[in-house]
Amino acid sequence: AVEHLLAAHPDLPLRHSISFLITGDEEGCAEDGTIRILEWCANQGERLDYCLVGEPTSVKRLGDCVKNGRRGSVNGTITVHGRQGHVAYPHLAANPIHLSLPLLEALVQHPFDEKKNTHFPPTSLQLTRIQSGDGSTNVIPAQLTAQFNIRFSTEHTPESLEKRIRSLLNPLLQGDYRYDLAMQVSGLPFLTQGGPLLQAIQTSIAELLNRPPELSTGGGTSDARFISQHCPQTVELGLVGTTMHQVDESAPVDDLTMLAQIYQRIMEKIFLL
């Protein structure tokens, strides 16, 4: 796309620049990839005006969906402490599994959103792991650990979510029994609402594909969650992602060709109009 842009417009003003950010640490903790490059750019005084992220945002056909934002993601671990004992003498123990049931029920049933955010799906808390004991059939375990993930909109912050969770749990676990709560942020929510980049993307898709794209903030997180902290105009547009993370991941060559044309048209609208 950039090659064709420069060939078609050799007199492109030199005040503009185009950079490629390609890293190999996008999955998992994602600590030594995009984050490090963005830190370097900030230290060098580099300013990012627009960022087009090539995530596979298309759902059924190329260009049918554009991600103009993403939900935030926070992982949490709750450890409920009871008292270990023999199952035949429950009065001498405190079963952390029993203690945890009302706590977990309160979490999964809680409506986190007081008002609907029209740009984001509802906040979702999903339990991802529950572990207690070592498999012994005659022992009441000493503790239970439950892990969860929350996907949230710009209506919330990690701090407000932790405060909400503690306000739910504190009344349910009193006396000598206690819980520990640890939360780790894996991404903050962002929203690009209007602006030159989003307008250029929507117009380019409509011109080349004869249909407007849908704007969405659903799905998982991407490196855009890091980039948006440095570049307020961050939007994602890419191929159809039906085979991503699968054996023989693939995309039609025609889609690749058309996507390059869309990217070129977007840059022309940004740089030349």
Please place each PLM-identified region on the residue numbering:
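Structural element of the ATP-grasp superfamily
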Residues: I78, F148, I201, F226-I227
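Zn-dependent metallopeptidase/amidohydrolase metal-coordination segment
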Residues: Q202-S204, L208-L273
